[in-house]
Amino acid sequence: MKVGIIGAMEQEVTLLRDQIENRQTIQRAGCEIYTGQIGGVDVALLKSGIGKVSAAMGTTLLLEHCKPDLVINTGSAGGLASTLKVGDIVVSEEVRYHDADVTAFGYEPGQMAGCPAAFVADDALIALAESCIKQLNLNAVRGLICSGDAFINGAEPLARIRATFPNVAAVEMEAAAVGHVCHLFGTPFVVVRAISDVADSESHMSFEEFLVVAAKQSTLMVNAMLQTLAKRG
C-alpha cells in the first residue's frame, strides 16, 4: 500500500518530511513530492502550494506519478464549528467550494458545473481517522469542510459562508480541490486538519501564532493513521 499525503505549506509538511526514510524528491511545476517510507509504510508526501489551483495541479501530479492507493489531506484550517478550538481536529465527511456559484444554471451553491455538489470522503478513512482521534484522546469534529481562494478574516465573508453552508465545520483553501481531483481519479481520500484559528475578524493573527501548533497536531494524526495502516498490513 502507498499513502499519498498532501499539505499546502512548508510548515504543514516539514515534520512529516523529516521522518521519511530513503527519501527522494520530485520537483515539478512548483510542487515538491517526497517519496520513501514512514514507519514501514510507503508514502508520497506532496507540498502543493496554497490555493485551489496549486492543490489541484499538485494532486494530479501526485496521483499520476506516484499512484497512491489513498490520499490524506493534512495541515491547518479555520474552525467554524462552535466546539472547535486551536489544536483540535476536523475530519471531512465531504468537501465543497464556498466560492463557486453557477446557481443561475440550476446548480447548488458551491457546485461546479458537471460535478457533484460535494466530494465525499471515504468511509473507511473517516473511520480510521476517528479511531486515531479516540486513541490520542483529541477533541474533534466530523463534518463539512469548505474551500475557497480566500483567507476568511472578517464578519462579512464568514456570515456569507455560514448562511450558505449552515453545517460547515471548517474552512481552508485546498481541500475541495484535492477531493475534486481524487473523485476524478477514483482515489479514496479524507481531509484531516488541525485548527489553527477560529475564523473571525482576528483570525489572521491567530493563524500566524498557532500554525506551528496545528502542524504538530495534524502530523500527530497522520502518524497515528500510518501506524494503524502498518499494523493492518
Curated annotation (Swiss-Prot):
Which InterPro entries does the entry mention? MTA_SAH_Nsdase, Nucleoside_phosphorylase_d, Nucleoside_phosphorylase_sf
HAMAP family for this protein = Salvage_MtnN
Under SUPFAM superfamilies, the record lists: Purine and uridine phosphorylases (SSF53167)
According to the entry, what is the taxonomic lineage of the organism? Answer: Bacteria, Pseudomonadati, Pseudomonadota, Gammaproteobacteria, Enterobacterales
Q: Which NCBIfam families match?
A: MTA_SAH-Nsdase (TIGR01704), PRK05584.1 (NF004079)
Indicate whether Hydrolase appears among the record's keywords: yes
Q: What is this protein called?
A: 5'-methylthioadenosine/S-adenosylhomocysteine nucleosidase
Alphabetized GO MF terms: adenosylhomocysteine nucleosidase activity; methylthioadenosine nucleosidase activity
User: Which protein family is it in?
Assistant: Belongs to the PNP/UDP phosphorylase family. MtnN subfamily.
From its record, what is one biological process in GO terms? L-methionine salvage from S-adenosylmethionine
Q: Name the EC number(s).
A: 3.2.2.9
Which residues make up the binding site for substrate? 78, 152, 173-174
Described function: Catalyzes the irreversible cleavage of the glycosidic bond in both 5'-methylthioadenosine (MTA) and S-adenosylhomocysteine (SAH/AdoHcy) to adenine and the corresponding thioribose, 5'-methylthioribose and S-ribosylhomocysteine, respectively. Also cleaves 5'-deoxyadenosine, a toxic by-product of radical S-adenosylmethionine (SAM) enzymes, into 5-deoxyribose and adenine. Thus, is required for in vivo function of the radical SAM enzymes biotin synthase and lipoic acid synthase, that are inhibited by 5'-deoxyadenosine accumulation.
Q: Provide the leader sequence positions.
A: none
Name of the encoding gene: mtnN
User: Whose protein is this, by species?
Assistant: Serratia proteamaculans (strain 568)
Any one of the GO CC terms? cytosol
Active site residues of this protein: 12, 197
Oligomeric form and interacting partners: Homodimer.
Q: Which UniProt keywords apply?
A: Amino-acid biosynthesis, Hydrolase, Methionine biosynthesis
Give me the reactions it catalyses.
Answer: S-adenosyl-L-homocysteine + H2O = S-(5-deoxy-D-ribos-5-yl)-L-homocysteine + adenine; S-methyl-5'-thioadenosine + H2O = 5-(methylsulfanyl)-D-ribose + adenine; 5'-deoxyadenosine + H2O = 5-deoxy-D-ribose + adenine
Question: Under which main EC class is this enzyme filed?
Answer: hydrolase
Q: In which pathway does it act?
A: Amino-acid biosynthesis; L-methionine biosynthesis via salvage pathway; S-methyl-5-thio-alpha-D-ribose 1-phosphate from S-methyl-5'-thioadenosine (hydrolase route): step 1/2
Q: Does the keyword Hydrolase apply?
A: yes
